[in-house]
Amino acid sequence: MSIALGNLFDLESQESGGSPLFMSPAPSTDPQPISGEKNGGDGGRIPVEEWLPITESRKGNVYTATFHLLCSGIGLQVILLPAAFAALGWVWGTIILTVGFVWKLYTTWLLVQLHEAVPGIRISRYVRLAIASFGVKLGKLLGIFPVMYLSGGACTILVITGGKSIQQLLQIMSDDNTAPLTSVQCFLVFSCIAMIMSQFPNLNSLFGVSLIGAFMGIAYCTVIWILPVASDSQRTQVSVSYATMDKSFVHIFNAIGLIALVYRGNNLVLEIQGTLPSDSKNPSCKTMWRAVMISHALVAICMFPLTFAVYWAYGDKIPATGGPVGNYLKLYTQEHSKRAACFIHLTFIFSCLCSYPINLMPACDNIEMVYITKKKKPASIIVRMMLRVFLSLVCFTIAVGFPFLPYLAVLIGAIALLVTFTYPCFMWISIKKPQRKSPMWLFNVLVGCLGASLSVLLLVASAMRLAQKGLHANFFRP
């Protein structure tokens, strides 16, 4: 039915280099009770977890988990959803958007249940679950790159998008429509603020940041769809067409890729659940699932109206190619007042800033794990601060050196798509071991294979699109 306890303890030993300092007491063959009543709900905790930022504090609750999920779930990619509809049309756009939402919700449920697949043992990191499911070598191969890409890559995209949005905001506020700062300077301003916000000691302490980020995300999504509905209520739709002109394989799958990118974020589910207390009477999966349902309901309330209203208002005027989010923000605000445009850009920038520390946390946790393994002691405040400054500088340098990364979002994101749509299904089969050819086994195999096939098709379509359209690779010239 589940992983043997001894295997999980062996996993911890292998991850920490086998040092006794980082190993739990010798495991027995019987399941260990969750000792939440004795240690504040931190049952199954190994010593090294007390030193790492993701599991340093387990005093979270349904509210902290909800806002963490909201802040990381309302991503900047939601702005691109109307572009996907411009390529797919009303019917197929709605079907794919809905199927993707349900698919993401299902795989999230799988991860929530796998967090404590064995009583007394908590797996609070996606990479660790991959290793527990597929073995050390294969688990690291399949898990580390996508998770590190989703962490560092998301922060890099946030620097590019947030920096460009700052520049656009300054242009809107200026009288002559010029920005007083260059793109690099705007990237630097964004990175410095984000770097400061990343100095919170652990994931649970980021609750205030997530709260602000969630409200900012809800605010800009709501205003973006309300403005065209309010201003176009008396307007006829003669000038707007909803016909899809290009029905090629490349065009269609690029649009599907834009929708798929919205549903990233499963790399943070286990980490957020790791901040919750757990005991035999109230396991963390119950609290986490309530948070997942609330956050996904709010994300749907933001995402679906924005997509439908903006596509209804602009139709074929929306570029269906994707690319920088700032171009779409400019399109959505150009027909409205300066105050409205400033509000949308400002809330969007704050949302990006608040998302940055949460997305950076898995990378910080992995780097600190390496440090702790070598030094056999927890990272000091200075060391932790310098590690986060270093990671932020890396993201800033990549953003300045490769400012065209938003044009490659579907190509690179197709690899990380497996984290959301594929791996959880096979993890469930590996750990829970349902009876072969049972409905649950067949369903997870089918869903997992569909996710892998989708990833391959998106990779092929993105590569073909690059071959056809080319890429303006403006290295170090943002």
Swiss-Prot record:
Disulfide bonds: none annotated. GO terms for biological process: amino acid transport. InterPro entries: AA_transpt_TM (IPR013057). Residues 15-45 are annotated as: Disordered. The chain crosses the membrane at residues 64-86, 90-112, 141-161, 178-198, 206-226, 242-262, 292-312, 341-361, 380-402, 407-429, 440-460. The keyword DNA-binding does not apply. Keywords: Amino-acid transport, Cell membrane, Membrane, Transmembrane, Transmembrane helix, Transport. Residues 1-63, 113-140, 199-205, 263-291, 362-379, 430-439 are cytoplasmic. It is a multi-pass membrane protein. It is found in: Cell membrane. Residues 87-89, 162-177, 227-241, 313-340, 403-406, 461-478 are extracellular. GO terms for cellular component: plasma membrane. Pfam families: Aa_trans. Belongs to the amino acid/polyamine transporter 2 family. Amino acid/auxin permease (AAAP) (TC 2.A.18.2) subfamily. Amino acid transporter. This is Lysine histidine transporter-like 7. The lineage of its organism: Eukaryota, Viridiplantae, Streptophyta, Embryophyta, Tracheophyta.
